[in-house]
């Protein structure tokens, strides 16, 4: 009887040992599967991040290629390629765009509705053209309000003349074209357009502040085309002629100084400069600055 019980006990112990082995084996398999899954997930995530970075770098390189560039035969295609590549990115990838000059704001920043602007690059100019030349801005709302506002005012004042536009900053032209599809003429394009349209009388009105580098470059371009027209006239920039030293202040500078001061006083909520002075209010006017000899204009102002 005791032999039978001993055999039963031995059988039970053996069965338990076998079950334990099976259970241990199952647990090991589960652990291995979990580790494998985690490794696979990490690898997939790393691969995805690498793909995101590569896509973002591609766009950054395309932006850098057009950011500061003299216009050439590839500019139009490069602008289109950069925008198409940007549009194909995910939101996550767009945040990763970073290059020498490139960043997410190049395409991603909302500066207003470009459709409200008018590039004024149409043909059918006629005999008389009034070319408004500006440095330019890539901020759509500002361009519509300021530059287009000036152009529209000139067109209303001189209805017998065709008002056209040119920007002197190719960096701005490329940005607006790539982001918004709006093609604005640079100086050479605008002058070529005038010649091709048979313009006889050309008046150039710059919106530049002073006789700086941009104004000088504009004049150099105009001089190469003077013999293509019957007459060419170029207006002064806003602050007029520079003057030989800080003590020589022309009427243009005096008029501008009075105008901006009056605007600042009004914006601050005062009826007069004296009223602002009584409240010990000071107005500070800030300029961009320049290494050009025209920097004396700031002292004159």
Label every model-predicted segment.
Residues 14-22:
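Hydrophobic core
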């Amino acid at each position: 009887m005791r032999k039978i019980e001993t055999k039963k006990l031995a059988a039970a112990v053996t069965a338990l040992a076998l079950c334990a082995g099976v259970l241990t084996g199952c647990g090991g398999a589960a652990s291995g599967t979990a580790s494998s899954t985690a490794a696979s997930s990490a690898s997939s995530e790393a691969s995805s991040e690498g793909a995101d970075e590569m896509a973002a770098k591609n766009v950054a390189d395309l932006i850098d290629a057009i950011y500061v560039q003299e216009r050439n035969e590839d500019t139009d295609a490069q602008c289109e390629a950069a925008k198409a590549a940007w549009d194909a990115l995910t939101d996550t990838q767009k945040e990763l765009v970073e290059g020498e000059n490139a960043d997410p704001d190049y395409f991603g920043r909302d500066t207003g509705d470009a459709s409200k602007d008018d590039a004024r690059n149409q043909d059918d100019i006629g005999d008389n053209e009034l070319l408004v030349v500006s440095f330019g801005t890539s901020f759509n709302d500002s361009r519509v309000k300021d530059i287009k506002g000036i152009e529209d005012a000139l067109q209303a004042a001189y209805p017998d003349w065709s008002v056209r536009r040119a920007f002197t900053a190719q960096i701005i032209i490329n940005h607006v074209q790539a982001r918004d599809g709006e093609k604005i003429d640079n100086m050479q394009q605008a002058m070529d357009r005038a010649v091709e349209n048979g313009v006889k009388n050309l008046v150039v009105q710059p919106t530049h502040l002073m006789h700086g580098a941009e104004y000088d470059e504009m004049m150099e371009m105009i001089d190469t085309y003077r013999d293509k027209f019957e007459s060419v006239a170029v207006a002064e920039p806003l602050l007029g002629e520079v003057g030989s030293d800080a003590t020589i202040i022309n009427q243009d500078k005096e008029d501008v100084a009075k105008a901006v001061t009056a605007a600042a006083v009004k914006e601050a909520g005062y009826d007069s400069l004296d009223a602002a002075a009584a409240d010990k209010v000071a107005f500070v006017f800030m300029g961009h600055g320049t290494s050009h000899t025209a920097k004396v204009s700031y002292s004159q102002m």
